[in-house]
A protein has these predicted regions:
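Leloir-type glycosyltransferase catalytic cores
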Residues: 1-38, 143-189
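Detector for Asparagine
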Residues: 15, 30-33, 41, 48, ...
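Non-catalytic interaction/regulatory modules that flank or connect domains
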Residues: 16-117
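Long, low-complexity regulatory tails in eukaryotic proteins
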Residues: 165-223
């Protein structure tokens, strides 16, 4: 049952008019779990993070000096598609929750071992499909499984050209907040963390990026 259905039922019992011109068609599995990411084109001070740590997107903007400054302020999970200087990993290992290494076209098979020697937990992930990933797996045999990052379109949304969505995940970049990678690439900044409704259009050139984060969204359409 969706939120507006509960409100409508309560209003009906109280004989109060309920006029809400939208209906929820999808709620992602992670929608109740607030998380904050930060692109290291800035250094931010955030206290009382919901998860207890910041997610640092070095894959969006690789900048080691800002990484160092951010680690001085917050514990971080680091997402990167490039190797990070091993001296940084060693110096800040108590501030690094884990490193998520994205295996891409310019992957470096030795990097997981450098992370391990620094005493930092890590995971391996990739946007590659199985056909492209299989020849690479042997290089990471001793490092562990490479988990796929899946681009998934829920059945409820396959036939929709556009809709409204709200997110529980925010990416901070250049002093602005974005409620998805789709919004970040389009420059669609959120008004606030609470008021972050945006419109999705499947013809947008960055539409494919939206589906990687679908579990973070609530989706509404006009009635």
């Amino acid at each position: 049952i969706y939120p507006e259905e509960i409100v409508e039922a309560v209003c009906k019992l109280l004989n109060i008019r309920f006029d809400f011109p939208y209906k929820t068609v999808f709620i992602g599995a992670n929608f109740q779990n607030l998380s904050i990411e930060c692109v290291p084109n800035q250094v931010v001070r955030i206290d009382n993070l919901p998860s207890g740590h910041l997610i640092l997107r070095m894959d969006y903007h690789f900048h080691e000096p800002n990484l160092v400054e951010q680690l001085k302020l917050n514990k971080c999970t680091i997402i990167t598609d490039r190797p990070i200087n091993k001296d940084i990993l060693r110096a800040f290992k108590t501030q690094i929750v884990e490193v998520i290494y994205i295996i891409g076209d310019n992957h470096v098979p030795d990097f997981p071992e450098q992370i391990r020697r620094a005493g930092v937990p890590f995971r391996l992930v990739s946007y590659f499909n199985e056909e492209k990933l299989n020849p690479i797996k042997l290089h990471y045999f001793d490092a562990g499984l490479i988990l796929p990052i899946i681009n998934r379109v829920p059945d409820e949304l396959k036939d929709l050209d556009s809709f409204y969505y709200k997110s529980c995940k925010f990416t901070l970049s250049e002093q602005k907040a974005f409620n998805s990678r789709y919004a970040l690439k389009n420059g669609f900044a959120a008004k606030s963390l609470g008021d972050n409704w945006q419109t999705f259009n499947k013809n947008n050139p960055h539409a494919a990026d939206f589906w990687y984060e679908i579990d973070n969204f609530q989706v509404l359409v006009d009635k």
